[in-house]
Protein backbone atom coordinates (compact mmCIF):
# COMPACT_ATOMS: atom_id res chain seq x y z
CA UNK A 1 0.00 0.00 0.00
CA UNK A 2 1.26 3.43 -0.78
CA UNK A 3 0.02 6.99 -0.66
CA UNK A 4 -0.36 8.30 -4.21
CA UNK A 5 -1.86 11.62 -3.21
CA UNK A 6 -3.10 13.23 -0.04
CA UNK A 7 -6.12 10.89 0.31
CA UNK A 8 -5.66 8.07 -2.21
CA UNK A 9 -3.82 4.93 -1.13
CA UNK A 10 -2.46 2.35 -3.55
CA UNK A 11 -3.05 -1.26 -2.45
CA UNK A 12 -2.34 -4.62 -3.98
CA UNK A 13 -5.44 -6.79 -4.31
CA UNK A 14 -4.06 -9.04 -1.55
CA UNK A 15 -3.54 -6.12 0.86
CA UNK A 16 -7.02 -4.77 0.05
CA UNK A 17 -8.58 -8.19 0.74
CA UNK A 18 -6.72 -8.55 4.06
CA UNK A 19 -7.73 -5.09 5.25
CA UNK A 20 -11.34 -5.63 4.16
CA UNK A 21 -11.45 -8.94 6.06
CA UNK A 22 -10.04 -7.21 9.15
CA UNK A 23 -12.70 -4.49 8.87
CA UNK A 24 -15.49 -7.06 8.50
CA UNK A 25 -14.27 -8.94 11.58
CA UNK A 26 -13.89 -5.78 13.69
CA UNK A 27 -17.30 -4.48 12.56
CA UNK A 28 -19.09 -7.78 13.25
CA UNK A 29 -17.87 -10.57 15.52
CA UNK A 30 -15.32 -8.44 17.39
CA UNK A 31 -17.96 -5.82 18.26
CA UNK A 32 -20.23 -8.55 19.61
CA UNK A 33 -17.38 -10.01 21.68
CA UNK A 34 -16.42 -6.68 23.23
CA UNK A 35 -20.07 -5.83 23.96
CA UNK A 36 -20.38 -9.15 25.82
CA UNK A 37 -17.21 -8.40 27.82
CA UNK A 38 -18.57 -4.97 28.77
CA UNK A 39 -21.95 -6.42 29.76
CA UNK A 40 -20.33 -9.14 31.88
CA UNK A 41 -18.07 -6.63 33.62
CA UNK A 42 -21.02 -4.27 34.21
CA UNK A 43 -22.87 -7.06 36.04
CA UNK A 44 -20.02 -7.25 38.56
CA UNK A 45 -21.29 -4.06 40.19
CA UNK A 46 -19.48 -0.81 41.01
CA UNK A 47 -17.97 0.45 37.73
CA UNK A 48 -15.64 2.98 39.37
CA UNK A 49 -13.24 0.28 40.55
CA UNK A 50 -14.05 -2.42 38.01
CA UNK A 51 -10.79 -3.12 36.17
CA UNK A 52 -12.41 -5.56 33.74
CA UNK A 53 -15.00 -2.99 32.72
CA UNK A 54 -12.43 -0.23 32.16
CA UNK A 55 -10.14 -2.59 30.21
CA UNK A 56 -13.03 -3.67 27.99
CA UNK A 57 -14.07 -0.05 27.35
CA UNK A 58 -10.47 0.84 26.45
CA UNK A 59 -10.29 -2.15 24.09
CA UNK A 60 -13.58 -1.04 22.53
CA UNK A 61 -12.19 2.46 21.93
CA UNK A 62 -9.07 1.10 20.22
CA UNK A 63 -11.18 -1.24 18.13
CA UNK A 64 -13.50 1.55 16.99
CA UNK A 65 -10.52 3.74 16.09
CA UNK A 66 -9.15 0.93 13.91
CA UNK A 67 -12.58 0.52 12.26
CA UNK A 68 -12.58 4.23 11.37
CA UNK A 69 -9.00 4.04 10.05
CA UNK A 70 -9.75 0.99 7.90
CA UNK A 71 -13.00 2.46 6.59
CA UNK A 72 -11.25 5.65 5.48
CA UNK A 73 -8.32 3.72 4.02
CA UNK A 74 -10.51 1.36 1.99
CA UNK A 75 -12.81 4.16 0.78
CA UNK A 76 -9.78 5.93 -0.70
CA UNK A 77 -7.97 2.85 -2.02
CA UNK A 78 -6.82 2.32 -5.58
CA UNK A 79 -6.33 -1.39 -6.08
CA UNK A 80 -3.65 -2.83 -8.33
CA UNK A 81 -2.30 0.37 -9.82
CA UNK A 82 1.45 0.03 -9.30
CA UNK A 83 3.62 3.14 -9.54
CA UNK A 84 5.36 3.81 -12.84
CA UNK A 85 8.88 2.41 -13.28
CA UNK A 86 10.26 5.77 -14.42
CA UNK A 87 13.21 6.01 -12.02
CA UNK A 88 11.47 8.49 -9.74
CA UNK A 89 11.00 7.58 -6.09
CA UNK A 90 7.32 7.29 -5.21
CA UNK A 91 5.22 5.35 -2.73
CA UNK A 92 5.07 1.70 -3.76
CA UNK A 93 8.71 1.66 -4.84
CA UNK A 94 11.61 -0.36 -3.48
CA UNK A 95 14.38 2.20 -3.10
CA UNK A 96 18.11 1.61 -2.77
CA UNK A 97 20.08 4.45 -1.23
CA UNK A 98 23.73 5.01 -0.36
CA UNK A 99 24.49 6.93 2.82
CA UNK A 100 26.75 9.97 2.38
CA UNK A 101 27.57 8.86 -1.16
CA UNK A 102 29.29 5.66 0.10
CA UNK A 103 28.04 2.98 -2.29
CA UNK A 104 29.24 0.28 0.13
CA UNK A 105 26.87 1.59 2.83
CA UNK A 106 23.44 1.01 1.27
CA UNK A 107 19.87 0.38 2.37
CA UNK A 108 16.99 -1.18 0.43
CA UNK A 109 13.54 -0.26 1.67
CA UNK A 110 9.92 -0.06 0.59
CA UNK A 111 8.42 3.43 0.57
CA UNK A 112 4.89 2.69 1.79
CA UNK A 113 2.41 3.11 4.62
CA UNK A 114 2.63 0.94 7.73
CA UNK A 115 -0.31 -1.26 6.70
CA UNK A 116 1.83 -2.49 3.83
CA UNK A 117 4.84 -3.36 5.99
CA UNK A 118 6.30 -6.74 5.16
CA UNK A 119 8.73 -9.06 6.89
CA UNK A 120 10.59 -9.30 3.56
CA UNK A 121 11.80 -5.70 3.45
CA UNK A 122 12.11 -2.72 5.74
CA UNK A 123 9.30 -0.20 5.20
CA UNK A 124 9.48 3.58 5.56
CA UNK A 125 6.41 5.79 5.44
CA UNK A 126 6.34 8.61 2.87
CA UNK A 127 5.75 10.91 5.87
CA UNK A 128 8.88 9.72 7.73
CA UNK A 129 11.98 11.92 7.60
CA UNK A 130 13.77 9.54 5.21
CA UNK A 131 10.62 8.91 3.17
CA UNK A 132 9.82 12.58 2.69
CA UNK A 133 13.47 13.29 1.87
CA UNK A 134 13.66 10.79 -0.99
CA UNK A 135 10.07 10.98 -2.27
CA UNK A 136 10.00 12.54 -5.75
CA UNK A 137 13.77 12.28 -6.29
CA UNK A 138 15.18 10.49 -9.34
CA UNK A 139 17.82 7.78 -9.53
CA UNK A 140 21.24 9.42 -9.31
CA UNK A 141 20.02 12.42 -7.32
CA UNK A 142 21.05 13.28 -3.78
CA UNK A 143 18.53 13.79 -0.99
CA UNK A 144 18.71 15.08 2.55
CA UNK A 145 16.59 14.33 5.58
CA UNK A 146 16.63 15.36 9.21
CA UNK A 147 17.83 12.91 11.85
CA UNK A 148 16.17 12.73 15.29
CA UNK A 149 19.07 14.73 16.75
CA UNK A 150 18.36 17.59 14.31
CA UNK A 151 21.35 16.98 12.04
CA UNK A 152 20.95 16.48 8.30
CA UNK A 153 21.88 13.21 6.63
CA UNK A 154 22.63 12.87 2.92
CA UNK A 155 21.79 9.90 0.73
CA UNK A 156 22.13 9.15 -2.97
CA UNK A 157 19.31 7.38 -4.80
CA UNK A 158 20.81 4.31 -6.49
CA UNK A 159 17.67 2.48 -7.59
CA UNK A 160 13.86 2.86 -7.50
CA UNK A 161 11.68 0.01 -8.75
CA UNK A 162 8.00 -0.88 -8.22
CA UNK A 163 7.43 -3.30 -5.33
CA UNK A 164 6.65 -6.79 -6.60
CA UNK A 165 5.63 -8.38 -3.27
From Swiss-Prot:
PANTHER family reported for this sequence: TRANSCRIPTION ELONGATION FACTOR GREA
Top-level taxon of the source organism: Bacteria
Similarity remark: Belongs to the GreA/GreB family.
Gene symbol of the encoding locus: greA
Entries under InterPro entries matching the protein: GreA/GreB_C_sf, TF_GreA/GreB_CS, Tscrpt_elong_fac_GreA, Tscrpt_elong_fac_GreA/B, Tscrpt_elong_fac_GreA/B_C, Tscrpt_elong_fac_GreA/B_fam, Tscrpt_elong_fac_GreA/B_N, Tscrpt_elong_fac_GreA/B_N_sf
Lineage summary: Bacteria, Bacillati, Actinomycetota, Actinomycetes, Kitasatosporales
UniProt keywords, alphabetically: Coiled coil, DNA-binding, Transcription, Transcription regulation
Any one GO molecular-function label of the UniProt entry: DNA binding
The keyword NAD appears for this protein: no
Pfam families: GreA_GreB (PF01272), GreA_GreB_N (PF03449)
Coiled-coil region list: 55-78
Function: Necessary for efficient RNA polymerase transcription elongation past template-encoded arresting sites. The arresting sites in DNA have the property of trapping a certain fraction of elongating RNA polymerases that pass through, resulting in locked ternary complexes. Cleavage of the nascent transcript by cleavage factors such as GreA or GreB allows the resumption of elongation from the new 3'terminus. GreA releases sequences of 2 to 3 nucleotides.
One GO term of the biological process aspect: DNA-templated transcription elongation
Name of protein: Transcription elongation factor GreA
Keyword Coiled coil: yes
